[in-house]
Design a protein with these regions (language model features):
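Accessory, usually C-terminal, subdomains that scaffold auxiliary metal cofactors
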Residues: 66-129
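Long, compositionally biased intrinsically disordered regions
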Residues: 128-138
Length: 138
């Protein structure tokens, strides 16, 4: 998961100018995964960030295009859901804040994540799709 540790004059971690950096990081990650995972492994993820094209473009199309509602339990810890409220400079996004605040009146205590505008999405694809996408062979 990317944190806001790469924000500068070129923008935040998902800025167009930084696609190469992010893909290099992911290439190194999947080179490591390929050494220990079985060839028929499936890569799965879950995040609200799969709503964002700038994030999806970092992954193989088969993975990014597999988006569907996340059905596992969702906990409000870390930035898995809260991250959508802040920008790359860790400032509050007023539009997102306003949606969350407006939704508090109907808040379901059993599902507080539903107050956020971008719900978590689940994605998955074969490891081979990642190896091919990052030029690591299949």
């Amino acid at each position: 998961h990317f944190n806001n540790r790469d924000t500068d004059a070129e923008g935040g971690p998902l800025a167009s100018a930084k696609i190469g950096r992010r893909r290099d990081e992911l290439t190194r990650l999947f080179a490591h995964v390929a050494k220990s995972a079985p060839p028929d492994a499936t890569v799965r993820g879950g995040s609200w960030l799969y709503h964002v094209e700038a994030y999806r473009r970092l992954f193989p199309p088969a993975y990014a295009d597999s988006r569907k509602p996340y059905t596992r339990p969702i906990a409000l810890r870390g930035t898995a859901t809260w991250g959508q409220v802040i920008d790359a400079h860790e400032r509050i996004r007023p539009a997102v804040r306003d949606v969350v605040l407006a939704n508090l009146a109907q808040l379901d205590p059993e599902a507080p994540h539903l107050a956020f505008p971008f719900q978590m999405l689940a994605v998955e694809a074969p490891l081979s799709a990642f190896l091919e996408f990052y030029g690591l062979g299949a």
